[in-house]
A protein has these predicted regions:
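Collagenous Gly-X-Y triple-helix signature in extracellular proteins
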Residues: 2-199
Length: 199
């Protein structure tokens, strides 16, 4: 059985650990950055159940979207982000830290052939890029968006929208090599203590 002194020492250690975690994660503010799972994330929006964030830097090396299709739902990049990166984040802050969200795969020319899918980790659509552009400074290289240029019903399944270093939207072949800026929704629960302390 633990003595009162041992309990007090353990409580002191827990309080110190809690203070460090609180300092590390801080209270998310739209437009500001937070660090989670060793990655710096820029907060794009405060949603009903969490915070929409984007990696402030490129995640890993430039890579292809997929080797033969501009359909995000079946892409190699989607699989990588929703397995490897999801695991890294959940190993750091626990299961339930990421919220699943719906992705609209509407093409630039209005084709709905690809429909929607649900992700834990994704990349921005063209519409989201435009909506949050004020929080997204220009980067040093091209990076992928989720939006296809068109779909097979218009005889093309390879072009995908990208963002240029100057912030202009263009397109590239799905097997091109571009940067990746993952997005996800962090559950408010991982920041609750910070939010409560600030109220």
């Amino acid at each position: 059985m633990m003595t009162l002194k041992e309990f007090g020492e353990n409580l002191k250690k827990l309080n110190l650990a809690y203070a460090e975690l609180k300092k590390k994660y801080g209270k998310p503010e739209v437009g500001k950055t937070i660090e989670v799972a060793g990655i710096t994330w820029r907060v794009l929006d405060k949603l009903e159940k969490g915070y929409l964030v984007i990696s402030d830097e490129f995640y890993g090396d430039s890579r292809e979207f997929d080797d033969n299709s501009n359909n995000w739902d079946s892409s190699d990049l989607r699989n990588e982000l929703n397995t490897d990166l999801r695991k890294k984040i959940e190993d750091s802050v626990g299961e339930g830290a990421l919220l699943k969200f719906t992705r609209d795969l509407l093409s630039m020319d209005g084709q709905t052939e690809y429909g929607t899918c649900e992700d834990y980790v994704s990349i921005l659509t063209v519409d989201e890029y435009r909506k949050y552009r004020k929080y997204l400074p220009n980067m040093e290289k091209w990076w992928w968006l989720i939006t296809p240029h068109t779909t097979p019903c218009n005889n093309n399944s390879s072009w995908v929208q990208v963002v240029s270093p100057s912030g202009r939207i263009d397109y590239d072949d799905c097997c091109g090599s571009d940067g990746v800026r993952p997005i996800c929704i962090f559950s408010s629960s991982i920041f609750e203590s910070c939010e409560e302390d600030d109220d």
